[in-house]
Design a protein with these regions (language model features):
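Polyanion-binding surfaces on beta-sheet-dominated domains and ring/shell assemblies
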Residues: 1-174, 178, 185
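Amphipathic, non-membrane alpha-helical rod segments
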Residues: 187-191
Length: 191
């Protein structure tokens, strides 16, 4: 049954249901938990999910250094998959019990200009609840539903492109002028 479940859910086209969220240089894709769960239940009415709870019956674990983490389990037939997800802010920074700051490169007029400080707010129960439901959707992806959305998630984040230097810009302008001359095209310099 497991292979049949995966094949069925993996081949379900979710493209029209993907929501995109851009923060900084990162664009993330999401599926609505309500839609994802409804699609699974339509096909597998016996499917069940569980939000794992820990000390004091809390639906998360917390570490002062790394932040909050939530866990879900989904069972379809005789197969259970567990999934976990850190509680993150809109810029994908781990949220903790207390606010904290971090440094990022500051760019001024296309040039690196030291560092600037950004902050991360403390997690709220709303943040934790939102993450639990995103964790559920990620858990459903382990059964095939929208799995391709997570392709590349495990790759390291690339650095943002560095702005071109004046030397590079002038070199490109000279090359454009040279090519225009070779092609016999009038080229008007923009200043």
């Amino acid at each position: 049954m497991n292979d049949k479940v995966f094949e069925t859910l993996f081949h379900l086209d979710v493209n029209s249901r993907v929501e995109k969220k851009k923060t900084g240089n990162t664009q993330l894709s999401y599926l609505s938990w309500a839609w994802a769960w409804a699609e699974v239940k339509k096909r597998y009415p016996e499917a069940a999910y569980k939000i794992l709870k820990f000390e004091n019956n809390l639906p998360y674990v917390y570490d002062a250094n790394t932040g909050y983490m939530v866990f879900t389990e989904v069972t379809i037939g005789d197969v259970t998959h567990e999934m976990w997800l850190p509680v993150m802010d809109g810029a994908n920074n781990a949220m903790k019990a207390e606010p904290y700051e971090y440094q990022v490169i500051k760019w001024t007029n296309g040039k690196r200009d030291g560092f600037t400080t950004k902050s991360v707010d403390p997690a709220t129960m709303f943040d934790i609840n939102k993450t639990i439901m995103r964790c559920l959707v990620k858990n459903l992806a382990m059964f095939g539903l929208g799995l391709y959305i997570y392709s590349g998630e495990d790759l390291p984040e690339s650095e943002p492109p560095k702005p071109a230097t004046d030397i590079q810009i002038n070199g490109i302008k000279k090359e454009i002028e040279r090519m225009a001359e070779l092609a016999g095209i009038a080229y008007e310099k923009a200043e």
